[in-house]
Amino acid sequence: MIDINAIKEALPHRYPMLLVDRVLEVSEDEIVALKNVTINEPFFNGHFPQYPVMPGVLIMEALAQTAGVLELSKEENKGKLVFYAGMDKVKFKKQVVPGDQLIMTAKFVKRRGTIAVVEAKAEVDGKLAASGTLTFAIGQ
């Protein structure tokens, strides 16, 4: 298991933008991680105060960070950055609210040089909350 210290070593993100709490499973090309969503998240102050819902773009960011942990934990990529290059086929199926535990899966399906394509999904209680195809560029 990759704990929060290893996540922080791999990713440059910090509060309030660090959206991965723990890695549950990891293999060469796939990772499963979680984010505990609490009412204390700063984005709930404005989205929406009377009906707090995690913004979909932040769910996708959490998925991107999940993929980033896997890629940046590899010896050859330590100290590098991963940048979003695109998103495709993004779908939001279920609202994510305070108290939810977001289980995020990212599977690398294609690599070409410094570009990688990832199939990603986020689930709450075994139900699909969001999914999409993410494209990344690995930079210096």
From Swiss-Prot:
Catalytic function, reaction form: a (3R)-hydroxyacyl-[ACP] = a (2E)-enoyl-[ACP] + H2O
Pfam families attached to this UniProt entry: FabA
Active-site residues, as the UniProt record annotates them: 47
GO BP annotation list: fatty acid biosynthetic process; lipid A biosynthetic process
EC main group: lyase
Subcellular location: Cytoplasm
EC number: 4.2.1.59
Single annotated GO MF: (3R)-hydroxyacyl-[acyl-carrier-protein] dehydratase activity
One of the record's GO cellular component terms: membrane
Keywords, sorted A to Z: Cytoplasm, Lipid A biosynthesis, Lipid biosynthesis, Lipid metabolism, Lyase
CDD domains: FabZ
Primary residence: cytoplasm
InterPro entries assigned: FabA_FabZ, FabZ, HotDog_dom_sf
Keyword Nucleus assigned: no
Similarity-based family: Belongs to the thioester dehydratase family. FabZ subfamily.
Function of the protein: Involved in unsaturated fatty acids biosynthesis. Catalyzes the dehydration of short chain beta-hydroxyacyl-ACPs and long chain saturated and unsaturated beta-hydroxyacyl-ACPs.
Name of the featured protein: 3-hydroxyacyl-[acyl-carrier-protein] dehydratase FabZ
Organism field: Streptococcus gordonii (strain Challis / ATCC 35105 / BCRC 15272 / CH1 / DL1 / V288)
